[in-house]
């Protein structure tokens, strides 16, 4: 990998984490020491226009926001974890100097991640939003089941009675979908995971669908609030008979994949897979 193209590095972080500012200052010094230019002022979108690489300090939530903010940009992201589990923030904060050395030496590749998109009319308002992890239609604060009518490519699947429904991207399979019983898929796989949340029918299981599918979800709840969330952020309420459509976005996000990192090794470590020994 040629590194002469990485001359300008943007640094952004989660301002809610006190350690973020200190880590950004440290990273800026390391970047400048390596003969590169560090940019620390501005939001993700403006920094992406200036930089050849964005370093993102925080947890997966910070990475998800950065990915949405720079949608349509080709500037790659490298996540530095100062949060919790951190599947997207692949580099531990203590390993930052080592990770940057790998970048300067060209020991990395770019990994393309698919974005997914939801569109439709919700409570009289037209919406269109992109997500890196997942799009969720779920019940509001009231602890009652909702009914969601779902079809794929025009073919009816079923009417779910559940707490909600997760449409996960390949990247998001290790997030909410996994917690709801969905399968883990490789982040480069060309699939959706359609996972019901606490379905009333035990036969309702997570379904893996091709990423070129068009998924339609219609709220069938005349007197109950139904919420649309994108990467964990509420974006709209659905009235009765409102419907949204989920499909692959035309945009992608590029992540930096360090040479010594592996998704399967990350699974073993983050999920504490021990295996069985007899």
Q: Where is each model-derived feature located?
A:
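Short glycine/serine/threonine-rich phosphate/pyrophosphate-binding segments
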Residues: 61-67, 174-179
């Amino acid at each position: 990998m040629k590194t002469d193209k990485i001359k300008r590095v943007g640094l952004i972080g989660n301002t809610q984490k006190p350690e973020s500012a200190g880590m950004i200052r440290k990273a800026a010094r390391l970047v400048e020491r390596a003969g590169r230019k560090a940019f620390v002022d501005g939001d993700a979108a403006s920094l992406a226009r200036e930089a050849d690489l964005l370093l993102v300090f925080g947890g997966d939530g910070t990475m998800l926001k950065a990915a949405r903010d720079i949608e349509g940009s080709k500037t790659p992201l490298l996540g530095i974890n100062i949060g919790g589990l951190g599947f997207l923030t692949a580099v531990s904060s203590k390993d930052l100097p080592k990770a940057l050395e790998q970048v300067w030496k060209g020991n990395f590749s770019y990994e393309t991640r698919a974005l997914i998109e939801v569109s439709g009319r919700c409570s009289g308002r037209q919406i269109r939003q992109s997500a890196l992890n997942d799009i969720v239609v779920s019940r509001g604060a009231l602890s009652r089941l909702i009914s969601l009518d779902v079809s794929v490519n025009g073919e009816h699947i079923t009417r779910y009675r559940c707490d909600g429904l997760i449409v996960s991207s390949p990247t998001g399979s290790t997030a909410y979908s996994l917690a709801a019983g969905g399968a883990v898929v490789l982040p480069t796989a060309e699939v959706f995971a359609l996972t019901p949340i606490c379905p009333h029918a035990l036969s309702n299981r997570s379904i893996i669908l091709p990423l070129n599918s068009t998924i339609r979800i219609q709220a069938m709840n005349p007197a109950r609030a139904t919420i649309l969330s994108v990467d964990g952020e509420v974006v709209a309420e659905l009235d009765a008979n409102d419907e949204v459509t989920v499909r692959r976005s035309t945009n992608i996000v590029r992540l930096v994949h360090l040479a010594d990192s592996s998704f399967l090794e990350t699974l073993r470590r983050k999920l504490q897979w021990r295996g069985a020994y007899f």
